[in-house]
Design a protein with these regions (language model features):
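Nucleotidyltransferase catalytic core that binds NTPs
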Residues: 1-167
Length: 167
């Protein structure tokens, strides 16, 4: 971590380049990561096993609101989400992004492996399909891999928020 919000985009890009120059395999994943739960951790741990260094991109607060997660989301501000993610041993770098998708980060970092959770499909080519992995076409073009890891059963931030609100 460089500051409370994670690496700046440029510093993260330099770090990724440094790792690549050391012939380390760079893995990239992204998400909101609000109300962290064991399902998030399992995806991150699985992602980390796909390479040597794991970069996690976190949606900014503004991005989360635009993604229609609800007017009261995220629960935790981006600085808290980034710091919590950076504390995991399996995570090597965290960067917050303000766009609706991480496509520009994927294109800038050029990871060797792009990882998403099991609600996505690695071979989905239709960018309008909710199962489409953003950046997958690019990663495959430069010879990288797209990996989808199984989700932990019964783990959902949205369901947890609903449960809390209804109790």
């Amino acid at each position: 971590m460089v500051d409370g919000d994670g690496y700046t985009r440029d510093v993260a890009a330099m770090q990724v380049q440094n790792w690549k120059e050391q012939n380390l395999k760079v893995v990239f994943t992204n998400g909101v990561f609000d109300l962290l739960h064991v399902g998030h951790l399992k995806v991150l741990e699985a992602a980390a096993t796909c390479g040597d260094r794991l970069v996690v991109a976190v949606n900014s607060d503004a991005s989360v609101k635009r993604l229609k997660k609800g007017p009261n989301r995220p629960i935790h501000p981006q600085v808290h989400r980034a710091r919590l993610l950076a504390a995991f041993r399996c995570v090597n770098a965290v960067v917050v992004f303000d766009e609706d998708t991480p496509l520009s980060l994927v294109q800038q970092f050029k990871p060797d492996v792009l990882v998403k959770g099991g609600d996505y499909e690695a071979d989905c080519a239709d960018s309008s399909d909710p199962r489409y992995v953003v950046g997958s076409k690019d990663v495959k073009l430069w010879g990288g891999q797209v990996v989808v890891v199984p989700l932990a059963t019964g783990q959902s931030t949205t369901a947890t928020v609903a449960k809390i609100r209804n109790s």
